[in-house]
Every structure is written in structure tokens, then in C-alpha cells.
Regions:
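Auxiliary alpha/beta "docking" domains used to position bulky ligands
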Residues: 1-136
């Protein structure tokens, strides 16, 4: 399947921001991660094994490319609250995974032996870096 066909399908299901990232390994990212660790700029939620963050083949040995999607996140204004906005409405992990599953189902229907893994802000790779690489 061509990249434009994939993007057209994604638009048909409401995903306007789609790109394709290469599979690395991402040695420039490794340097950034090590510097952030040295400076203490971590949240504790990151994958602790750096190689898993910079080498997609550690997560999926036969990976050929990475489809990256960005989703709008506006849920309205809540001025009188101490809760983060992501706490309102349906869990975005569920919504995003459902939409990504639609893409994977479409690809599985059109590509023999299509294999995939879905991550929605919960995988070992660095989402923002993949978005950068994919051009979105």
C-alpha cells in the first residue's frame, strides 16, 4: 500500500495528521536521552532501557516502518477544577487505540502477513521524536 493510500484511508476515518517514520536505530536520540538522564530531566514514566527507546527492532523484530498519528485533544474549558484536562471525558488511550486498530485492520485486509503493534502514549519509543521523524 502506498503512503498516500494510507493517508486517504486515515482521513476517511477522521485522522488528518499521519506520517511514516523510519525504523532507526536513532543514535542522535540516544545522545539526547543520556543528556536528559545526566541532567535529571526524567519523569520516571519513561522506558528505563535506553536501547528500547531508540531501536524499534527491540520492540518488534520485523518492523519495516512506523505509522505515526496525531490526534486533537480539545475537550472544552473547565475553569473551576484542580484536575488535568485529560481526566475529563473518555480515556484518550482507549479512543486512540480504537482508531489505530481501524488502521491496522485496513492494512491487514490489504497486505499479506501484515504484523503490527499498537501504542497510544504507552510504548517504549519516544512519541514526540517519532512525530518529528514522520514529518508531523
Amino acid at each position: 500500500m502506498k503512503k498516500e493510500e494510507l493517508k486517504d484511508f486515515c482521513k476517511s476515518i477522521g485522522i488528518d495528521c499521519v506520517g511514516i517514520a523510519g525504523v532507526g536505530p536513532y543514535y542522535d536520540l540516544e545522545k539526547i536521552i543520556k543528556q536528559r538522564l545526566f541532567n535529571g530531566y526524567t519523569t520516571g514514566m519513561e522506558e528505563p532501557i535506553i536501547e528500547k527507546r531508540v531501536n524499534p527492532k527491540e520492540t518488534m523484530e520485523n518492523v519495516k516502518s512506523i505509522i505515526v498519528c496525531a490526534f486533537p485533544y480539545y475537550i472544552g474549558n473547565f475553569n473551576e477544577s484542580n484536575l488535568s484536562k485529560y481526566c475529563y471525558g473518555e480515556d484518550y488511550h482507549i479512543v486512540v487505540k480504537d482508531m489505530l486498530q481501524q488502521i491496522c485492520n485496513h492494512l491487514s485486509d490489504n497486505i499479506d502477513n501484515f504484523d503490527y503493534k499498537i501504542f497510544a502514549d504507552n510504548g517504549p519509543l519516544v512519541d514526540r521524536y517519532l512525530a518529528y521523524l514522520s514529518g508531523i
